[in-house]
Each structure stands twice: as structure tokens, then as C-alpha cells.
Amino acid sequence: MGKPWFVYLVRAANGSLYCGISDDPQRRFAAHQKGQGARYFKTSPAQALVYVEQWPDKSAALRQERLVKRLRKSAKEALVASFGGLGEISPCGASADPPRLSAAP
């Protein structure tokens, strides 16, 4: 099995949530804070890494990222509220099928 990948949410200064994937979300967040990587943070700087979930590989993380990006903001906020912090990152995708998220219609 390869290196795990992570889906993460970062809160921007304007209150919005940015979703991305990385094999090292803390390093990626530090890059976002420096204005590197995503153009998203040019207008509203990255403030906090608020949600992280681990996936077994990049492909699974990409599939989950697409699902999370399609969620309404209220559903993303629910993910953030359910997150116990960086010490509580547990592997997702133990089964062949990732959890089903309901995307906004």
C-alpha cells in the first residue's frame, strides 16, 4: 500500500472554506498561508486548517475531494464541526467504496 493522501478544508479570512488534497496537509496549509499554491488565497488569506481526512491513495482522495467540493457550505461546516482536531485523523476508505456524501442539487 502506498503513501496515504488527505482531503482537507482550510478556512479563509473571509469565512469561506477551501477544499484540497495533499500527501502532507500541514505542509500544504503552511504553503497556503504564505500565498503559495492555490490562487484562492490571493484575495482572502488562509486562516486555519479546519478539517482533514485520510485516504489510502491519491485516487481515493481525489474522488472524495470532488464530492466535498460539491457540498453546500452548511454541509462542509457540519464536517468541520464533527472534526476532532489533527490528533484525531483516522483512515477513511477502509472498504472498497468511500462514504457517500450528498452533493448539493
Swiss-Prot record:
Outline the extent of the GIY-YIG domain. Answer: 3-78
Q: Which domain of life is it from?
A: Bacteria
Q: Which InterPro entries match?
A: GIY-YIG_endonuc, GIY-YIG_endonuc_sf, UPF0213_domain
- Give the span(s) annotated as Disordered: 85-105
Question: What are the coiled-coil residue ranges?
Answer: none
- One Pfam family this sequence matches: GIY-YIG
Q: Give the family this protein belongs to, as stated in its UniProt record.
A: Belongs to the UPF0213 family.
Name listed for the protein in its UniProt record: UPF0213 protein PP_0972
- Species per Swiss-Prot/TrEMBL record: Pseudomonas putida (strain ATCC 47054 / DSM 6125 / CFBP 8728 / NCIMB 11950 / KT2440)
